Amino acid sequence: MNLRKTGILLAWAMIIAANGTAQNVQRTSQGIKYAAQGMNVSVEFYSPSIVRVYKTPGETASDKESLVVIKAPEQTPVSFGENGKNVTLSSQMIQVEVNPETGGIHFFDKLGQRLLTDKDYGTQFTPFNDAGVPSYNVRQAFLLDKDEVIYGLGQQQTGKVNQRNQKLFLRNQNMSICIPFIHSIKGYALYWDNYSPTTFLDNPQETSFDSEVGDCADYYFIYGGNADGVIAGVRDLTGQAPLYPLWTLGFWQCRERYKSPDELCEVVDKYRELKVPLDGIIQDWQYWGCNENWNSMKFQNPRYINKMGDPEYMKFLPNGEDKNADYGTPRIKSPKEMIDYVHKQNAHIMISVWASFGPWTEMYQKMDSLKALLHFETWPPKAGVKPYDPYNPAARDIYWEAMKKNIFDLGMDAWWLDSTEPDHMDIKDQDFNTQTYLGSFRRVHNAFPLMSNKGVYEHQRATTSDKRVFLLTRSSFLGQQRYASHSWSGDVTSEWSVMRKQLAAGLNYALCGIPYWNTDLGGFFAWRYNNNVNNIAYHELHVRWYQWGVFQPIMRSHNSS
């Protein structure tokens, strides 16, 4: 140890000895540890601009492996001091002031301007029975400036850009992407590292995150000085966003759904005939057939494999589809031929793959034998369909093996990972007691899309470097940008008020540091315009939505019947 380091440690020891309230403070290589309010607390610099605060109840300190944060603490020069009863830690970017008696933590910029306060006595651990495992409800309160504007919280359908003065229940569902992350106009962000359903509350008294289950209070303070700096910090902490291939960033045609290879290819033909630019087309659901065969990850619908009339395959005909409907003699007779035809037309193709499986599928049987099915009601209801457990690495292996063998090896370009919340029908509280590889579903619920996208991205990257990964998915969580994941705002309706809400939703989502997002142009459900597509108001709505769509990373038309 050199003399300079020895002097610093001696000075620190003198501070502790002189200050009774700091006697339980221990210096670490990047911060401090101390006990306060019946908790063990760690304050650690991950970089000059990122600080992690980690609190555990009781006398035993434990750590956790984050699903979101991939950055390891970097060597950061930190100076230590004291200010009355408080201990101070300073990097070249920020200063942190800790009161070991009250548990309060204050964050300042290098000029001494207060940025955020972790409130005195603001951490609460309430014992909670997590499906038989002793745990806690965890609540953490902060103090913001009265007129401070904050963004983030994922993609919400409130129409609010400023996320102050409201209460939100953060549990991923269709149209609502829930990320416990706030981005302040003052040039900092706060990420609450908890994956369970969480209530965000902001009122004149405090701003808080209240999570249903957790073993710790764990958050990251990220200072950037401005929005670009904050986003750079978020990606340093949780992963960079890969650059997509150019063909992804254009116009995509999609609908619910194309019912045969011929229909899909004829749409591509029409765009080329009209000389309207088209970069890609998307095959939606039921290429696998009926609901019992849901998401088999195989082309088993007889219309896709030229097997109409064959008893072996007619059982897979989609529910409600007329087996006697005459589509004529098929021009495109196989999935491989369909994909090749799209490529010959200088376009790309994406396909829908879901996070659940029907009871007839080989995938259902494999996941069930692995105990990797989540047994609650999902879409489509009353068909025996169950979501899989993406937290289980073996389940992610099985998932990709089927995608590769049955679809990717045919030449498929991109993936539409639908229903990655996942869809949850007839919700019951006990559903969240369902066990996953990482504990109760309640404990890890909001990280479902992160883990599902992780599996596909990492496996495709391991399979080949010749084709960049492109994932379109309906749900998301912080860190998902590192998996080449692009989200859209779900099954929104064709209304001016709904279009307006997407503006706020997309801006707040992007300010979480995740750049790739779009919305269904014109709305997915037409609702009051059903059977009235010639309505001039409907036309005007589409025109305006398409004009906005030009400026979204992906311009995608996707509508239901």
Give the role of each language-model region.
Residues Q23-Q37:
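Short N-terminal segments immediately surrounding and downstream of signal-peptide cleavage
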Residues V25, S29, E44-V87, F125-F128:
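A low-complexity, Ser/Thr/Gly/Pro-enriched, surface-exposed linker/loop concept
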Residues E82-T248, C254-R257, P261-E263, V268-E273:
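Catalytic and substrate-binding clefts that recognize carbohydrates or anionic sugar/phosphate headgroups
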Residues E266-Q286:
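Catalytic domains of carbohydrate-active enzymes, especially glycoside hydrolases
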Residues G280-S561:
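Aromatic- and carboxylate-enriched substrate-binding clefts and catalytic-loop regions
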